[in-house]
């Protein structure tokens, strides 16, 4: 089920990834490519473990990634 946090997360992650491909980014952070694709398409809610991995990689606050705070 798509919700506002999933949509905000997908938009923010796409922005942070820039020109990096899903394949490249998934390998860098150790998330299966298909799982990452589903996050970006708002087809799957992100796990806390993967959310932390992504936040750590980009050195970004989790609340910012989820759209609960502005950059």
Predicted regions mapped to residue ranges:
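Short, Lys/Arg-enriched C-terminal cap helix and immediately downstream tail that follows
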Residues: 16, 48-49
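Short amphipathic recognition helices of helix-turn-helix/homeodomain-type DNA-binding modules
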Residues: 64-71
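DNA major-groove recognition helix of helix-turn-helix/homeodomain DNA-binding modules
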Residues: 49-64
């Amino acid at each position: 089920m798509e919700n506002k946090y999933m949509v905000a997360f997908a938009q923010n992650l796409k922005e942070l990834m820039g020109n990096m491909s899903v394949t490249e980014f998934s390998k860098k952070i150790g998330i299966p490519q298909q799982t990452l694709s589903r996050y970006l398409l708002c087809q799957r809610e992100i796990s806390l473990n993967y959310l932390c991995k992504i936040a750590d990689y980009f050195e970004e606050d989790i609340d910012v990634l989820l759209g609960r705070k502005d950059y």
